[in-house]
Curated annotation (Swiss-Prot):
It catalyses: N-acetyl-D-glutamate = N-acetyl-L-glutamate. Disulfide bonds: none annotated. Disruption phenotype: The growth of the deletion mutant is significantly reduced with D-glutamate as the sole nitrogen source. InterPro entries: DgoD-like (IPR034593), Dipeptide_epimerase (IPR034603), Enolase-like_C_sf (IPR036849), Enolase-like_N (IPR029017), Enolase_C-like (IPR029065), Mandel_Rmase/mucon_lact_enz_CS (IPR018110), Mandelate_racemase_C (IPR013342), Mandelate_racemase_N_dom (IPR013341). Its EC number is 5.1.1.25. Belongs to the mandelate racemase/muconate lactonizing enzyme family. The lineage of its organism: Bacteria, Pseudomonadati, Pseudomonadota, Gammaproteobacteria, Alteromonadales. The gene is dgcA. This is N-acetyl-D-glutamate racemase. It is an enzyme of class 5 (isomerase).
Amino acid sequence: MIVVVIADKEFYGWAESVPYARYDESISTSTKQIKALFCDRSFTRKMELSELINTLPAGAARNALDCAMWDLQAKQSTRPVAEILSKTSITSICAHTLSIDTPKAMQEAVLAMNSPPLVKVKLDKQDIIARMTAIANAAPHSQFIVDANEDWCFRDLEENVEALKALNVVLIEQPLPAGEDEQLINFTSPIPLCADESCHTENDLPYLQGRYQVVNIKLDKTGGLTQACSLASKAQKMGFDIMLGCMVGSSLAMAPASLLASQARYVDLDGPLLVLKDRKHHFTYADGQMSPLQSCLWGGAHNSERFFVDRLQLQ
């Protein structure tokens, strides 16, 4: 992960992003993008810095900078980001992720989750129905999102979708590889289909119409909260439902995205459950629900995690 801090003489803003190898990103390449942007530059206007950040492509580097700018603006204006954007921080049902394994192991894993309302199940093209049947039998009161991670072919989708619907699957995420989505044109799926790897910014939406019914918004794909807000607004106007997704990161990485939860039909921001140590003022997850954002973590007029920022040594 990357943590970025942007400061003036009195205030600072911070944010976290997670470079993703699927998009040819790494901590090294993203850090180089950020350093190159600021090399031998000083700024006298916030707008000047914002314009420079927007010259970066959508991705993890821009995400960290954009969200740090929002946090800084909250401190400078003494107005929380939620207030600036007219958003409400809410408690939301959050999907818990179930990783690929044998049917028996996945069944045992979902049993240990204690009947969560929503489970995201990672499924490749092997044993699709056998795995899903074992999981559904162990959690008969749960609903499921199946994430194929681009691994299926159209025949896999066509042959399994009816059986998956009977197993309480309510959404299928990125069944086909990005770029092969044209096979979904005129396919009437009994389960809504969600674009993940095929959806990065609002510019992708016209292509996705007629292929998907839901778009997965991840700030590391959009390049920050600014574009995520635009994408969510335009997507809803075009008739798409919203899913909020994330990479594996701490609560700081989830914080900006959580402000869009009230617009989302599906929330999948469980990244902090997969890290060894979370932030001091972190989200809590209980009974399948994710707590509202604590503005003392990010996006508030004050930030009680200043002790962490003071320790950062930016090279």
